[in-house]
């Protein structure tokens, strides 16, 4: 019973629509009605700007981290990665936003921040490296997921490998329309890293 409640709590934590809340508070808009219509961090950056977008990223990371910490906080024998996965599912299919959420890159990163802080830090570095090279947030997210999967193989932690592979597969699937736009050369590139406005 307690285990079920923990997973429900982790899911509800992941379901908190950070992008929607910050969009309403910072700009008075529903970001689902702007840009790509997605509740995630990329659309938050695109529609709200760097400052508000950064808050959304931080909040989404925090959701994953807190969810992964729940077993320790509540003294329940559940692996932190599994609690984290519940939050990731909540982020992608949030009960508080009609089950239409983000692509879970930041929330997945938050889970790993709790479980493997060094892996999280290398992920952030690799993401920004890919972003600097490609200027595509979507492609950088996918490539970072693939990097994380390869990294996890060297840890000999089978559950970590399984969870990272699962999350990466979800991230790639959730970016399928972005992949098509990259192929068609219609995917927007970021401008703020190059100093353009």
UniProtKB/Swiss-Prot annotation:
Pathway the protein takes part in: Lipid metabolism; phospholipid metabolism
Reaction it catalyzes: an acyl phosphate + sn-glycerol 3-phosphate = a 1-acyl-sn-glycero-3-phosphate + phosphate
UniProt-listed SMART domains: G3P_acyltransf
GO cellular component labels: plasma membrane
Database matches in Pfam families: G3P_acyltransf
Transmembrane feature ranges: 2-22, 69-89, 111-131, 153-173
Coiled coil: none
Keyword match Membrane: yes
Claim: Nuclease is one of the keywords in the record: no
Listed InterPro entries: G3P_acylTferase_PlsY (IPR003811)
Enzyme kind, highest EC tier: transferase
Location within or outside the cell: Cell membrane
EC number assigned by the record: 2.3.1.275
Alphabetical keyword list: Cell membrane, Lipid biosynthesis, Lipid metabolism, Membrane, Phospholipid biosynthesis, Phospholipid metabolism, Transferase, Transmembrane, Transmembrane helix
Superkingdom classification of source: Bacteria
Annotated membrane topology: Multi-pass membrane protein
One biological process term in Gene Ontology: phospholipid biosynthetic process
Main subcellular location of this protein, as a coarse class: membrane
GO MF annotations in UniProt: acyl-phosphate glycerol-3-phosphate acyltransferase activity
Binding partners and assembly: Probably interacts with PlsX.
Function text: Catalyzes the transfer of an acyl group from acyl-phosphate (acyl-PO(4)) to glycerol-3-phosphate (G3P) to form lysophosphatidic acid (LPA). This enzyme utilizes acyl-phosphate as fatty acyl donor, but not acyl-CoA or acyl-ACP.
The protein's name: Glycerol-3-phosphate acyltransferase
């Amino acid at each position: 019973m307690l285990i079920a409640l923990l997973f429900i709590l982790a899911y509800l934590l992941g379901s908190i629509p950070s992008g929607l809340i910050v969009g309403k508070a910072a700009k008075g808009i529903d970001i689902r009605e702007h840009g790509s219509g997605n509740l995630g961090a990329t659309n938050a950056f695109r529609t709200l700007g760097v400052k508000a977008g950064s808050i959304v990223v931080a909040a989404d990371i925090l959701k994953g981290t807190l969810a992964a910490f729940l077993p320790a906080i509540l003294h329940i024998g559940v692996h932190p990665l599994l609690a984290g996965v519940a939050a990731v599912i909540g982020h992608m299919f949030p009960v508080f936003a009609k089950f239409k959420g983000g692509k879970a890159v930041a929330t997945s990163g938050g889970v790993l921040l709790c479980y493997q802080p060094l892996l999280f830090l290398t992920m952030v570095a690799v993401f920004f490296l890919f972003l600097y090279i490609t200027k595509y947030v979507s492609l950088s997210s996918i490539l970072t997921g693939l990097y994380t999967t390869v990294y996890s193989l060297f840890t000999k932690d089978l559950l970590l490998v399984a969870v990272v592979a699962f999350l990466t597969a979800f991230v790639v699937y959730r970016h399928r329309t972005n992949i098509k736009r990259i192929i068609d050369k219609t995917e927007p590139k970021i401008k703020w890293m190059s100093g353009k406005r």
